[in-house]
C-alpha cells in the first residue's frame, strides 16, 4: 500500500523552509522540547485566532517568534495589550527574552492548516462532512488554488464503522518537487469520537531557489 509522505517535509531545502531556525549542539533536545512547548501553548491560547504557522528563531538568549494568523487584531489586542501578555507568559515559560512578530495571512482560503481547522469546526457544529468538504474546495478554487484534496477519516456521520472519504478538485502533484503544495491537518472532536482532517492545496509550480 502506498503511504503519503508529509509534502512539506518532502520539499524541505528544495522549495520549502524550516519552521524552526536555530542551531544547537549539547542542548539540542532541551531547545527542541522548548519549541514544542511554545507551539502547544500558542496553539491552545490562540486557537480562535486562526493560527496558520509558527516560526521560531533563536540567537543567544533571545527567541523570536513569527506567528502567521488570519486574525492579527485578536492577537495584538487593544493597543498591543494582548501581545504583551502573551510575551510575558512565554518569558515565564522559557526564561528567555521573547520577541513576537505577527504576520497576516491574506487569503485564509488558500492556507491548508486554516482550511483543515475550518472543516473541523464545521464537523463539530454537526454540519454534514461532504457539505463542509465541498464548501472548502469551492472557495479555495475561487481564490486561485490550482488543485485541492481534502480527506476526512473517522466515524463519519456517526456511522458504526470508521472510514475514510476524500474529495479532490484540480491537480495535486505529490511527486513533483517544484510543486508548491501546502499541507495542514486538524481533528474534529465530535460526540462519536475524533475525526481527522487532512488538506493538500496545490498553488502552482515554483522554481527551486526562488
Swiss-Prot record:
This is Small ribosomal subunit protein uS3. It comes from Pelobacter propionicus (strain DSM 2379 / NBRC 103807 / OttBd1). Part of the 30S ribosomal subunit. Forms a tight complex with proteins S10 and S14. One of its GO terms (biological process) is translation. The gene is rpsC. GO terms for molecular function: mRNA binding; rRNA binding; structural constituent of ribosome. One of its GO terms (cellular component) is cytosolic small ribosomal subunit. Pfam families: KH_2 (PF07650), Ribosomal_S3_C (PF00189). Belongs to the universal ribosomal protein uS3 family. Binds the lower part of the 30S subunit head. Binds mRNA in the 70S ribosome, positioning it for translation. Keywords: Ribonucleoprotein, Ribosomal protein, RNA-binding, rRNA-binding. Residues 38-106 form the KH type-2 domain. It comes from the Bacteria.
Amino acid at each position: 500500500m502506498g503511504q503519503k509522505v508529509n509534502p512539506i517535509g518532502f520539499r524541505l531545502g528544495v522549495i520549502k523552509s524550516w519552521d524552526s531556525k536555530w542551531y544547537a549542539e549539547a542542548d539540542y533536545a532541551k531547545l527542541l522540547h522548548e519549541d514544542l512547548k511554545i507551539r502547544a501553548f500558542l496553539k491552545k491560547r490562540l486557537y480562535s485566532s486562526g493560527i496558520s504557522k509558527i516560526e521560531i528563531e533563536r540567537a543567544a538568549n533571545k527567541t523570536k517568534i513569527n506567528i502567521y494568523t488570519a486574525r492579527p487584531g485578536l492577537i495584538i489586542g487593544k493597543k498591543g495589550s494582548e501581545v504583551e501578555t502573551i510575551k510575558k507568559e512565554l518569558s515565564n515559560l522559557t526564561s528567555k527574552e521573547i520577541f513576537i512578530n505577527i504576520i497576516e495571512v491574506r487569503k485564509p482560503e488558500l492556507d491548508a492548516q486554516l482550511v483543515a481547522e475550518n472543516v473541523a469546526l464545521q464537523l463539530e457544529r454537526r454540519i454534514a462532512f461532504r457539505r463542509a468538504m465541498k464548501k472548502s474546495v469551492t472557495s479555495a478554487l475561487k481564490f486561485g488554488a490550482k488543485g485541492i484534496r481534502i480527506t476526512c477519516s473517522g466515524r463519519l456521520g456517526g456511522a458504526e464503522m470508521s472510514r475514510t472519504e476524500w474529495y479532490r478538485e484540480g491537480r495535486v502533484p505529490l511527486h513533483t518537487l517544484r510543486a508548491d503544495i501546502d499541507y495542514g491537518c486538524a481533528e474534529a472532536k465530535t460526540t462519536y469520537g475524533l475525526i481527522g482532517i487532512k488538506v493538500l492545496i496545490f498553488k502552482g509550480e515554483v522554481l527551486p531557489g526562488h
